[in-house]
């Protein structure tokens, strides 16, 4: 269900985030100054409840923490202005695949970057 090597998965995710963030920054440079835009970072989880000894009370907290981690990466590593970012957590409540299978759950554990007006 999960990639065996979390470091490899994290590196791949960071590369994808960096690629998309650069595209969004380029687009931002072409937008008129009077339009107040942000990159919205949305965290999502699968539908498996969090139980046991964990840092997160539930999937809401986990999705928010994932989004915040990406926002911090975009600020600290990619140099994106914090005023241009928003971190949001949606828990398990906006699945892209409603099936109750390992593949669907993997698809639902995701980060989405959305370019939008503030």
Predicted regions and their residues:
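Periplasmic OmpA-like peptidoglycan-binding domain that tethers envelope proteins to the cell wall
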Residues: 3-7, 11-23, 28, 37-40, ...
């Amino acid at each position: 269900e999960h990639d065996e090597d979390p470091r490899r998965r994290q590196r791949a995710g960071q590369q994808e985030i960096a690629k998309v963030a650069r595209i969004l920054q380029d687009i931002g440079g072409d937008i008129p100054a009077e339009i107040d835009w942000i990159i919205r970072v949305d965290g999502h989880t699968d539908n498996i409840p969090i139980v046991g000894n964990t840092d997160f009370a539930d999937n809401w907290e986990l999705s928010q923490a994932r989004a915040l981690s990406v926002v911090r990466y975009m600020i600290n590593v990619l140099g994106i202005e914090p005023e241009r970012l928003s971190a949001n957590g949606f828990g398990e409540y906006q699945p892209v695949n409603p099936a109750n299978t390992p593949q669907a759950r993997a698809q639902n554990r995701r980060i989405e970057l959305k370019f939008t007006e503030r």
